[in-house]
């Protein structure tokens, strides 16, 4: 939505580019007067299907109606909870409206949303990964401390704890709904956010930023001309096996042996989307031109 950090990043990537005048921006959100709404030519309020007075079908009907009325050519997703709904209804929306919906397949969304499925995807494809356990398969007495405990479903570091011992771990497990226990990788100074663009069955472009976090979001990013080859090769392998559609964000750390290990997949644009455009990597414009100019 136009009020989300991701939505605003998408809008700013267009508005602050040399192609700004080429596009009319139609925004959607669940609240009036969001920051991003003032950067759009129009902004519509959608029914909130998390509330009792609205349903998912009503939401889809309203969205589809506005896409047709405004002759929208391409739809970007700026809110996490919309991803799976749009992924499951992408074919019908595109058939009914001729609007391209930039969202990955449901399988990709599920792998990204579920941290244990992320781990299984990496493990099953022989890619480096943090050791990851469900509580019922974890040997608490033989863990290497510290470890990370976090929700199986979640994003932006919500409910994520670094724990130093068994007592603390058991306490945190009881605080978290559907938790997983994960190996602690490297340190906070070796964390990267990596963006990829995957279209037409191939990896089109990528970027890696070293990042520092505040409240689960990136507040400081560093871009280096020479990116670690191991990270580059690792990203390439993940992208070609995962096969997302459009933009996908990969969070990883490099361990003490220099091995990159991914711990989170966000099959969507990132909060750093606009920051990346300042480094010459404007993924939104790239996708717009690749899809609309065919």
Description of each model-found segment:
Residues 108-188, 198-202, 229:
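Active-site nucleotide/adenylate-binding loops and adjacent lid/helix of ATP-dependent enzymes
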Residues 46, 78, 135, 209, ...:
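Conserved residues at the C-terminal ends of beta-strands
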Residues 147, 204, 261-264:
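Protein kinase-like catalytic core scaffold
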Residues 167, 177, 182-243, 247, ...:
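ATP-dependent carboxylate/phosphate-activation module, predominantly the ATP-grasp catalytic core
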Residues 1-101:
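ATP-binding N-terminal substructure of ATP-dependent carboxylate-amine bond-forming enzymes
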